[in-house]
């Protein structure tokens, strides 16, 4: 339909957004802000509507919708109009809808710019907002006397916040939490501008009529997850997950070494090959009481920490098997 063509042609989902995607895909020669400027220049060519024009276009759209329903057999015909005349009304309604949408695309940009820290590019927010604008035009009832911009802002904002909730986070937050988080961050920014410091949770809560506990909870829920594979040292050898204790799991030391009676431990380790035995003794400080890290053991043996970890894992499994075969008492 013509209206859908407008949303594709004149919104960020259309030619301008397609161009933006193409530019980014081919090296990003033009910054997003330049593309937004190009888009604004394009949509600024369509004049804004006054209230009378909004009513006129709404009436034309309504007539076109009714005519389409008659043509489709969904509405009982109460008119002597021919199919050609009904089709003319449908076409006029689509043109009116196109004009209505084009004339309000700047409103979408204004709303989208309220979400600078959403995690999504501005052009993507505009794209989602344009879908909300189309919905607003379709649902607008001029008889209720509402100003269209006020009515449409709600639909645009809803489309944008839902997109943020669905796309911008690894873990999806409910829409109402995304909106609450937005209000909290807006208060934080305004407070920082006025006072030159970040507000305490109690100060944010007082501004929003909430509680400090609620503010803290929302901010905690909104934290981005951290990858367990993230490197935490300059060499990239130690990962964040290596530093976290798994309190629900039995450690290798508990599962193997404490299983064995100390007087028989040397005998079991002696059954391993010389290099593996040396690695196990260094890792758990069996000879001198000082445990070494994977990196330290690796340097001593000229191996990477990952290779040491693999050897250690295999050796512990072998020690378990040897312990079972020799009938060691697990309670020792």
From Swiss-Prot:
Motif Polymerase core binding positions after renumbering to this chain: 124-137
Region feature (Disordered): 1-25
GO biological process, one term: DNA-templated transcription initiation
InterPro entries tied to this protein: RNA_pol_sigma-70_dom (IPR014284), RNA_pol_sigma70 (IPR000943), RNA_pol_sigma70_r1_2 (IPR009042), RNA_pol_sigma70_r2 (IPR007627), RNA_pol_sigma70_r3 (IPR007624), RNA_pol_sigma70_r4 (IPR007630), RNA_pol_sigma_r2 (IPR013325), RNA_pol_sigma_r3/r4-like (IPR013324)
Gene3D superfamilies from the UniProt entry: RNA Polymerase Primary Sigma Factor (1.10.601.10), Winged helix-like DNA-binding domain superfamily/Winged helix DNA-binding domain (1.10.10.10)
Compositionally biased intervals (Polar residues): 10-22
Pfam families for this protein: Sigma70_r1_2 (PF00140), Sigma70_r2 (PF04542), Sigma70_r3 (PF04539), Sigma70_r4 (PF04545)
Family, similarity comment: Belongs to the sigma-70 factor family.
Entry function: Sigma factors are initiation factors that promote the attachment of RNA polymerase to specific initiation sites and are then released.
Protein name per the record: RNA polymerase principal sigma factor HrdD
Organism of provenance: Streptomyces viridifaciens
């Amino acid at each position: 339909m013509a209206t859908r063509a407008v949303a594709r042609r004149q919104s960020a989902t259309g030619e301008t957004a397609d161009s933006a995607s193409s530019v980014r895909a081919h090296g990003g020669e033009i910054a997003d802000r330049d593309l937004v400027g190009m888009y604004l220049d394009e949509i600024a060519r369509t004049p804004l509507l006054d209230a009378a024009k909004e009513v006129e276009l709404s009436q034309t759209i309504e007539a076109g919708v009714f005519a389409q329903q008659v043509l489709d057999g969904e509405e009982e015909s109460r008119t002597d109009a021919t199919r050609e005349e009904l089709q003319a009304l449908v076409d006029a309604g689509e043109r009116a809808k196109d004009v209505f949408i084009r004339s309000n695309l700047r409103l979408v940009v204004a709303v989208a710019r309220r979400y600078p820290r959403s995690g999504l590019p501005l052009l993507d927010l505009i794209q989602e907002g344009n879908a909300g604008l189309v919905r607003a035009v379709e649902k607008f009832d001029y008889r209720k006397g509402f100003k269209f911009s006020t009515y449409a802002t709600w639909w645009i904002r809803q489309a944008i916040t839902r997109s943020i909730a669905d796309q911008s986070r690894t873990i999806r937050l409910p829409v109402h939490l995304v909106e609450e988080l937005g209000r909290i961050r807006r208060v934080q920014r305004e407070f920082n501008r006025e006072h030159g410091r970040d507000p305490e949770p109690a100060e944010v809560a007082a501004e929003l009529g909430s509680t400090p506990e609620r503010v803290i909870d929302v901010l905690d829920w909104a934290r981005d997850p951290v990858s367990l594979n993230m490197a935490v040292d300059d060499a990239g050898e130690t990962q964040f997950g290596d530093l976290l204790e798994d309190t629900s799991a039995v450690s290798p030391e508990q599962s193997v070494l404490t299983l064995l009676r100390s007087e028989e431990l040397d005998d079991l380790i002696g059954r391993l090959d010389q290099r593996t035995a040396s690695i196990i003794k260094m890792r758990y400080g069996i000879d001198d009481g000082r445990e070494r890290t994977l990196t330290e053991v690796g340097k001593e043996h000229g191996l990477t920490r990952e290779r040491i970890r693999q050897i250690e894992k295999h050796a512990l499994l072998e020690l378990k098997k040897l312990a079972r075969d020799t009938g060691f008492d697990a309670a020792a």
